[in-house]
C-alpha cells in the first residue's frame, strides 16, 4: 500500500443524558454542588427512625442553599442491633425486605421530585456501617463478619476481601440490585444508580483483582439491562480505593456501562492531616487534593468521561464535634473544592459536580455521648463515626453561607464544553471550524472570542492568524452550540477561547491544539553534503566493535514458558548498552519485538507468561535505562557531531538489532520495533539505518525538525542553545550539528511499513515535528491521532491495541 491511511481516535465525546420515564432531559452540562444524605429514606419511612416533618424541613433547607443533588443509601443489610451498623435495615435476610423502608424510598423520591431534586442511590457497601460485603458473605456461608469496633479493621478487611471471589455472595447482591432497580427505575428523581459505596477489592492478588473488575462490569451491565435510561457509576474512591493502583481504577472506569467516574477525598483518613493540627495542615491537604484531582482528571480526559467528587470532608477546628463550633479550616477546604469545580465548568474540564460529606442539617446532638445510639437523630456521620465529625449543620452559619454563595456562583457561570475533539484534526473536505457548547443555568448574553494562533510562533510573537468574536444568547438550562470557522493553511494551531464577564472584560478560558492537513506540512531537509558519509562511517565503526554479550537470568520474572534476562553488550566506542530480554524456553524460531525506551524512562521487566511465543528486548541505550546516570544527555558532546551523545545512541539502536539477530531462537525475517518519544526516534533510526526491521510503530517521536521545534516549545532546543552559549559555541554551528541527528533527514530511507501515533496536545514533541519526519516517508505508512492526548501515548488504550495489531500483522506475514 502506498500513501497514507489516517486513523483518528474513535471514542465519542462525552454526553450524559439523564432521562425521566419517556422524556429525555439532557443535563450533560448541569454542574452541581450537592451533599451526602445517606439516611433520607429512613426519615421518609413509616417505622423506627422516621421523621416526615424533619425530612420536609431538611429538603427545603437544602433547596434554599442551592443543593439539589443528594447521594443516598438505598438501605442497610442484615440484622439490627450491631453498634457500628445503621438501623433499621432495609434487607433483613436474602430477599426479605422491610416494607417500611421500601415505602420510605418511594416517599423520599417523591419528595425530591416535588422539589426538582435528584438522588444518586448506592446499592451496596464495602464497609461495615450498612452491612454490604460482610453481610452478603455471612448469608453465603463464609462465616461471621468481624465487628470493626471489637475486632479491628484488619480482621474485617481480611474477611471482606473474599467478596469479589465469592460467587454466592455476589449473586445475592445481584438479586438485591435487580429488586431495587426494577422497583424504582421509573422515578423522575433518580440522577443515577451506583454499584456500591466505596467498592474495593481489598487484595493485591491478581486473581482477586480480575474478579473484582468482572464484578463491577457485570453489575454495571445488569443495571443497564434493567434501566437503560439512567446513568451508572461505580461509587469508588479512585486510586486510594484501588489498592493504590491507578491501573486497577482505570480498568473499572473503562467499563462501557459506567457513564461517569467517581472519586472520594479524605485528608484525615488518608493521613494528609492530623487530629491535633487540623488548621495547620490545611495547605498540605489542599496540595494533596489538587494532585489527586489532577491525576484522575487526566484519566477521565482520556476516557471522555466526567468526574464527580462525590465524597469529601474536613474536620472542624480543634477537632471538635459540636455543631456551630468554628469551621475555618473546613470552610477553606470546601471553598477550594468549589473553586476547582467552577473553574473546570468554565473551561470545559472533567469535573461535573461534588457532594460534600455529609448533611447534618437540623439534627440535634446528644450531649452525653458522641457515638450514635437508638433514639438519637441521624446526621451525616453513620453510627461507626463520632456524631458531628464530618456533618454540616444548619447551625454552621459560615459553611452554609459558603455553600449558598458557591451554588449561586456556579448557577451564574457560563460553562463551556468542546464536543467532537476528533474534528480538531481537519483533513480533505473537512470544514475548518471548532465547535463550542455554551451553557448557563440563568438567562444571559455573552461575547465569545476565538483566536487561531500558529504553533510556530508560540515561543515568539504568538501571531494570531484569525480572530472571531460572536455574541451568544443563552436561555436558562439550555445548551447552545457555536462554530468558529477560519481559513487556515496546512499546519497546527492553538485555538484560544475567551468569554466576556459581567464587568465587560474578556477573560481567557481555555486553549488547545488543532491541525489542518498535516500531511501537507512542508519542512525542508537540512542534511549536509556529508550526511550519508558520516553515518556510513559510524556504522562501519560500530561493526568493528565486538558485542561481548553478558546475560543474567532474572528468576522472579522467568517462568516455565519464557526466561527473562538482564543483558549488556558493547556498542560504538566500546560503550555499554543492553536492556531486558525475554525469550521462549522451548527450541524453535520466534518473532521478535524490539522496544526502545523514552528519554530517561525507567526500565521494567517482562513477565515470562506474557507473549510466551515472542522474543522481546527492552532497549537501554548508553547511560540510560538500566545504566541510568545523571541525565541531560542531549547536552553532551555539543562540540562536534562525532562526540554528540546521539551519535552513539543512534548506533545503539542499530546494535540492539545486531543482538536480536545473534540469538539462535530469533527468526530474523520477523523483527519489528516500537517506542515512544526518544524511543520513537530510535524506531525511525532502526528502520532508516538498518533494513532488518520489518515494521515500526513510533509514537510521539523525538529529535525531529529542530529549526521549527524551538519556535513551538522551549525544550529541548532552547536548553541546548543555552548550553551552547555557556560553551561559547555559535547557534548556527549547533543547528548544523543537530542536522546530522534530525529524524526528518533519515525517514526517506525507511522502506518498511510504518504506523505513527501522535498526541494532538503534545507539549514535548509537538505534532508539527512528528510530521516533519513522517511526510518524508515514501512507502507504506499510516498515522493515528489521539486528539486529547499530550505526550503520554502509552496511556491511550486504543492506540496500544492498534499498535499491537499492526505489529502482529507484520510479524505473521
Role assignments for model-derived ranges:
Residues 543-586:
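N-terminal cap/lid segment of alpha/beta-hydrolase-fold proteins
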Residues 750, 756-758:
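Short beta-strand/loop motif that positions the catalytic acidic residue
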Amino acid at each position: 500500500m502506498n500513501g497514507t491511511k489516517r486513523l483518528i481516535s474513535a471514542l465519542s465525546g462525552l454526553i450524559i443524558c439523564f432521562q425521566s420515564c419517556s422524556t429525555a432531559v439532557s443535563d450533560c452540562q448541569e454542574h452541581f454542588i450537592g451533599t451526602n444524605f445517606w439516611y433520607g429514606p429512613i426519615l421518609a419511612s413509616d417505622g423506627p427512625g422516621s421523621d416526615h416533618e424533619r425530612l420536609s424541613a431538611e429538603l427545603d433547607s437544602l433547596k434554599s442553599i442551592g443543593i439539589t443533588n443528594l447521594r443516598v443509601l438505598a438501605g442497610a443489610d442484615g440484622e439490627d442491633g450491631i453498634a457500628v451498623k445503621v438501623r433499621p435495615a432495609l434487607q433483613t435476610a436474602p430477599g426479605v425486605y422491610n416494607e417500611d423502608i421500601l415505602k420510605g424510598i418511594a416517599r423520599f423520591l417523591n419528595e425530591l421530585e416535588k422539589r426538582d431534586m435528584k438522588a444518586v442511590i448506592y446499592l451496596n457497601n464495602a464497609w461495615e456501617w450498612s452491612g454490604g460485603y460482610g453481610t452478603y458473605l455471612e448469608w453465603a456461608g463464609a462465616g461471621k463478619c468481624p465487628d470493626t469496633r471489637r475486632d479491628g479493621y484488619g480482621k474485617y478487611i481480611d474477611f471482606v476481601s473474599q467478596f469479589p471471589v465469592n460467587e454466592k455472595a455476589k449473586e445475592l447482591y445481584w438479586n438485591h440490585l435487580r429488586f431495587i432497580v426494577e422497583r424504582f427505575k421509573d422515578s423522575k428523581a433518580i440522577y443515577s444508580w451506583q454499584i456500591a459505596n466505596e467498592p474495593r477489592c481489598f487484595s493485591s492478588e491478581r486473581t482477586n483483582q480480575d474478579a473484582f473488575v468482572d464484578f463491577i462490569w457485570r453489575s454495571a451491565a445488569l443495571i443497564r439491562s434493567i434501566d437503560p435510561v439512567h446513568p451508572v457509576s461505580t461509587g469508588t474512591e479512585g486510586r486510594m480505593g484501588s489498592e493504590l493502583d491507578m491501573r486497577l481504577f482505570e480498568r473499572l472506569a473503562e467499563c462501557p456501562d459506567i457513564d461517569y467516574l467517581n472519586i472520594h477525598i479524605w485528608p484525615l483518613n488518608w493521613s494528609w492531616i492530623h487530629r491535633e493540627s487540623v488548621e495547620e495542615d490545611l495547605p498540605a491537604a489542599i496540595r494533596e487534593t489538587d494532585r489527586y484531582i489532577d491525576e484522575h482528571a487526566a484519566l477521565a480526559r482520556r476516557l471522555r468521561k466526567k468526574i464527580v467528587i462525590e465524597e469529601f470532608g474536613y474536620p472542624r477546628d480543634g477537632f471538635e464535634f459540636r455543631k456551630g463550633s468554628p469551621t475555618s479550616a473546613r470552610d477553606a477546604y470546601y471553598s477550594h473544592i468549589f473553586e476547582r469545580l467552577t473553574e473546570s465548568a468554565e473551561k470545559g474540564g472533567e469535573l461535573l459536580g461534588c457532594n460534600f460529606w455529609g448533611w447534618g442539617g437540623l439534627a440535634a446532638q446528644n450531649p452525653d455521648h458522641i457515638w450514635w445510639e437508638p433514639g438519637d437523630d441521624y446526621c451525616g456521620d453513620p453510627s461507626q463515626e463520632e456524631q458531628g465529625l464530618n456533618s454540616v449543620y444548619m447551625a454552621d452559619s459560615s459553611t452554609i453561607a459558603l455553600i449558598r454563595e458557591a451554588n449561586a456562583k456556579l448557577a451564574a457561570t457560563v460553562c463551556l464544553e468542546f464536543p467532537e475533539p476528533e474534528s480538531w484534526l481537519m483533513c480533505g473536505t473537512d470544514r475548518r471550524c471548532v465547535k463550542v457548547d455554551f451553557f448557563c443555568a440563568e438567562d444571559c448574553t455573552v461575547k465569545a472570542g476565538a483566536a487561531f494562533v500558529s504553533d510556530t510562533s508560540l515561543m515568539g510573537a504568538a501571531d494570531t492568524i484569525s480572530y472571531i468574536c460572536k455574541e451568544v444568547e443563552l436561555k436558562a438550562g439550555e445548551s447552545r452550540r457555536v462554530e468558529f470557522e477560519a481559513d487556515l493553511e496546512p499546519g497546527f494551531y492553538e485555538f484560544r477561547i475567551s468569554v466576556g464577564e459581567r464587568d465587560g472584560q474578556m477573560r481567557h478560558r481555555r486553549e488547545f491544539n488543532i491541525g489542518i492537513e498535516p500531511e501537507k506540512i512542508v519542512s525542508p531537509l537540512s542534511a549536509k553534503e556529508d550526511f550519508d558519509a558520516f553515518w556510513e562511517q559510524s556504522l562501519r565503526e560500530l561493526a568493528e566493535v565486538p558485542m561481548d554479550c553478558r546475560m543474567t537470568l532474572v528468576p522472579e520474572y522467568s517462568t516455565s514458558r519464557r526466561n527473562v534476562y538482564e543483558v549488556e553488550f558493547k556498542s560504538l566506542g566500546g560503550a555499554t548498552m543492553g536492556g531486558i530480554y525475554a525469550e521462549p524456553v522451548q527450541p524453535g524460531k520466534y518473532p521478535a519485538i524490539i522496544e526502545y525506551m523514552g528519554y530517561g524512562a525507567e526500565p521494567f521487566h517482562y513477565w515470562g507468561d506474557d507473549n510466551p511465543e515472542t522474543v522481546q528486548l527492552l532497549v537501554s541505550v548508553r547511560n540510560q535505562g538500566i545504566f541510568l546516570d545523571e541525565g541531560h544527555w542531549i547536552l553532551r558532546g555539543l562540540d562536534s557531531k562525532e562526540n554528540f551523545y546521539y551519535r552513539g545512541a543512534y548506533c545503539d539502536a542499530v546494535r540492539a538489532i545486531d543482538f536480536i539477530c545473534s540469538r539462535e531462537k530469533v527468526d530474523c525475517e520477523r523483527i519489528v520495533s516500537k517506542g515512544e518519544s526518544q524511543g520513537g526516534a530510535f524506531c525511525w533510526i532502526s528502520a532508516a539505518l538498518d533494513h532488518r526491521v520489518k515494521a515500526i510503530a513510533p509514537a510521539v517521536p523525538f529529535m525531529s525538525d529542530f529549526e521549527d521545534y524551538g519556535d513551538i516549545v522551549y525544550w529541548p532546543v532552547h536548553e541546548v542553545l543555552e548550553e551552547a552559549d555557556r560553551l561559547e559555541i555559535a547557534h548556527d554551528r549547533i543547528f548544523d550539528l543537530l542536522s546530522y541527528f534530525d529524524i526528518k533527514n533519515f525517514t526517506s530511507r525507511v522502506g518498511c511499513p510504518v504506523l505513527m501515533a501522535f498526541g494532538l496536545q503534545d507539549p514535548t514533541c509537538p505534532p508539527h515535528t512528528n510530521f516533519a519526519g513522517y511526510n518524508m516517508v515514501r512507502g507504506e505508512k499510516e498515522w493515528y491521532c489521539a486528539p486529547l492526548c499530550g505526550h503520554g501515548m502509552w496511556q491511550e488504550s486504543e492506540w496500544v491495541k492498534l499498535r499491537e495489531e499492526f505489529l502482529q500483522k507484520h510479524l505473521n506475514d
